[in-house]
Amino acid sequence: MSTPASLSLAAVIPCHNDAETLAPLIGALARLGPFAQVIVIDDASDPPLHARTLLKAAGKQARAMPPDWLRILRHATPLGAGAARNLGLSLVTAPHVIFLDADDMVLPDLADLARDLAHDPTARSFDFCIFQHHDTRGDQERLWGQRPFDDRLWRQAGLALGALGPVGPDQAALLVQTANYPWNKIYRTGFLRDKGIGCTPLMVHNDVELHWRSFLLADRIIASDRIGVVHVWRPKGNRLTNRHTAERLRLFPVLDALAEEIALSDRPDLSRAFNAFVWGLADWIGAHLPAEDRPALHAHAARFWLTRTPPEARQALRADRGALLDRLGIG
């Protein structure tokens, strides 16, 4: 029996000194089947990545792929995952794309989802499909799947169970509040290009823009309960997620521009969700930021409060999250 046809997918993967985890990921992508392209952006790894070495470590099926299946481009200096993803996207020729991290693991459900999307009438002409994932922070708790906050939002949206289904505006306003990850979505390449959607070229928080503008500008969103990717959480080491410096404050001009774009869209549901997201993120940044950088954070927070937080949102924040405002210096 022949295997049902699948979407043609490209995988774009930034990598900085992660060859040991990248090679197994490349091997898994070769085995899964729907990946027509794998584009790796070497973000100034030391030593540099080499296709032959990676394919040797990735296994027999990866080595049997066509010569142009794996493409590696290199940044001479580290520019971050956002710039790497943007470069990778510019080279995609497949009609659909997924952005993966070099230490992610992909599961058979991802290939099944690609086949679902190719054959289910409800999925025709989708702009992106958001799917579920497993976060390894749950391993110690013997929990499989997403973190409780994200899982609760999926349940509130009525989408926690069901292999494939369209996402309405009210449901989108809930799912947009999930963690701003790039690797839990399959995008239509033309959608990203037509709308000018990409990542922010920052070292940290570079996926916020991709996440929110995708939800804002998509005409057709699909959701799937399939768990397609394992997100490996590494609380120690030199990973960008573990860097808590003033560079995180560079996100605030991006947040300001996003708030303006969302406000002009006449989507009050997304505006409320985004405002709540910004204040939660600012509080998280403040909890990890060195004391000498907190006055700058408070200045950014005060500016966002005055210019981007409408009166009704201020009232709700004062009533429900007064302690948060105190921590951010909002009187």
Predicted regions and their residues:
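C-terminal subregions of glycosyltransferases and related glycan-biosynthesis enzymes
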Residues: 223, 227-331
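Cell-envelope/extracellular polymer assembly enzymes that use nucleotide-activated donors
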Residues: 7-10, 37, 209
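Membrane-interface aromatic/basic loop that binds lipid-linked glycans or pyrophosphate carriers
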Residues: 1-5, 31-35, 60-70, 83, ...
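Glycine-rich, basic loop-to-helix element that forms the pyrophosphate-binding segment
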Residues: 75-92
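Donor-binding/catalytic cores of nucleotide-activated saccharide
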Residues: 102-205, 209-224, 230-247
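A conserved hydrophobic helix/loop-capping motif in glycosyltransferases and polysaccharide synthases
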Residues: 9-21, 25, 32-33, 41
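Short aromatic/hydrophobic "clamp" motif used to bind/position activated sugar donors
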Residues: 97
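Acidic donor-binding segment of Leloir-type glycosyltransferases
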Residues: 26-74
